[in-house]
Amino acid sequence: MHIYKVGGAVRDRLLGRPVSDIDWLVVGATVEEMLANGYRPVGADFPVFLHPKTGEEYALARTERKSGRGYGGFTFHASPDVTLEEDLIRRDLTINAMAEDEAGTVYDPYQGKNDLDQRLLRHVSPAFAEDPLRVLRVARFAARYAPLGFRVADETLALMRQISASGELQALTAERSWKEIERALMEVQPQVFFKVLSACGALQELLPELDDGSRTLAALEQAAAHEQPLNVRWACLLRGLPPTSIKAVNQRLKAPRECQELAMLTGECLAQGNQALELPATALLELLQKFDVYRRPQRFEDFLTVCEMAARGDGEQGYPQADYLRGAAAAARAVDVKPLVQAGLTGQALGEALKGERLKALEAYQRG
């Protein structure tokens, strides 16, 4: 039995980056040997075990063969006679196809170290084209390592175009697609992810509503530069699309509710946000009510952040509308409902009276 660190742990150590999760590979062992050594089986599709003390995952070396459509259409074979090289060749990129033994010796049968030095994302073998999910994974790695100067190798981009043209991307489930998009959005340069997808034809297959033009991606780039959360980044990406298109994208990818809500509200209200300084008090009140700023102030704050990131992406140095709208929200929230309740108002009458008082507060705010 031989145990190796594989994949990202080896790659990131060689790049001098922090290593968080470690994937372990076991060569030359049987399921029975693993169980006898106290490992607990957890793999549903192929033999994966949890270490009895650390709880880390250890996978038996395996080969795979394409047996159906999509990223799940593979038959796996795990046995003690599967070699380290046979296991590594099934991996996506050469930089992910290195192994390190317990003595620290690195095994690099597919020249991953050379590609690290050349800053290239290159596929290991032609079998790369059998898994459509790899198109998204490579684009995500391009976004992650763009600050280090990495790019997708020309021959790998050609294979990604082949996958995009084959229709195999349509076999990806919404959940798997969103998982990759979500992870890509949180990278340092998420705009690179969408540029790579555009370059290989995958964006047209997965997100035909999206234009990868600089104006759209500039807002996302600003959001990433300012370390904004996922929902803000998603709304920045979709801003500028008509609400019907935003709704279609949200539903097709099954984005989380928080992301869907902010993207939809941004699509519906971005123009009002930009025109805030000229809006009458009635329109201001309507905008605040639409965001339910009284009960959900953070959602409105996230909207203002999207507006600011979009403005910065368009070349604006500041966004004075944000502070103006924050002041308006504070003025409306400051209205005390207690006197209205004490006056005996209830139900619809109370709601109308409260609305009227908030309108007066906004008018006073505008007068300064």
UniProtKB/Swiss-Prot annotation:
Signal peptide extent: none
BP term (GO), one: RNA repair
Catalysed transformations (reactions): a tRNA precursor + 2 CTP + ATP = a tRNA with a 3' CCA end + 3 diphosphate; a tRNA with a 3' CCA end + 2 CTP + ATP = a tRNA with a 3' CCACCA end + 3 diphosphate
Keywords: ATP-binding, Hydrolase, Magnesium, Metal-binding, Multifunctional enzyme, Nickel, Nucleotide-binding, Nucleotidyltransferase, RNA repair, RNA-binding, Transferase, tRNA processing
Cofactor: Mg(2+); Ni(2+)
Positions of CTP binding: G8, R11, R91, R137, R140
Binding site for ATP: G8, R11, R91, R137, R140
One matching Pfam family: PolyA_pol_RNAbd
Binding site for Mg(2+): D21, D23
SUPFAM superfamilies the record matches: Nucleotidyltransferase, Poly A polymerase C-terminal region-like
GO MF term set: ATP binding; CCA tRNA nucleotidyltransferase activity; cyclic-nucleotide phosphodiesterase activity; magnesium ion binding; phosphatase activity; tRNA binding
Source organism, top-level taxon: Bacteria
Assembly: Monomer. Can also form homodimers and oligomers.
Additional notes on this entry: A single active site specifically recognizes both ATP and CTP and is responsible for their addition.
Functional description taken from the UniProt entry: Catalyzes the addition and repair of the essential 3'-terminal CCA sequence in tRNAs without using a nucleic acid template. Adds these three nucleotides in the order of C, C, and A to the tRNA nucleotide-73, using CTP and ATP as substrates and producing inorganic pyrophosphate. tRNA 3'-terminal CCA addition is required both for tRNA processing and repair. Also involved in tRNA surveillance by mediating tandem CCA addition to generate a CCACCA at the 3' terminus of unstable tRNAs. While stable tRNAs receive only 3'-terminal CCA, unstable tRNAs are marked with CCACCA and rapidly degraded.
Protein name per the record: Multifunctional CCA protein
Source organism: Pseudomonas putida (strain ATCC 47054 / DSM 6125 / CFBP 8728 / NCIMB 11950 / KT2440)
Lineage, broadest ranks: Bacteria, Pseudomonadati, Pseudomonadota, Gammaproteobacteria, Pseudomonadales
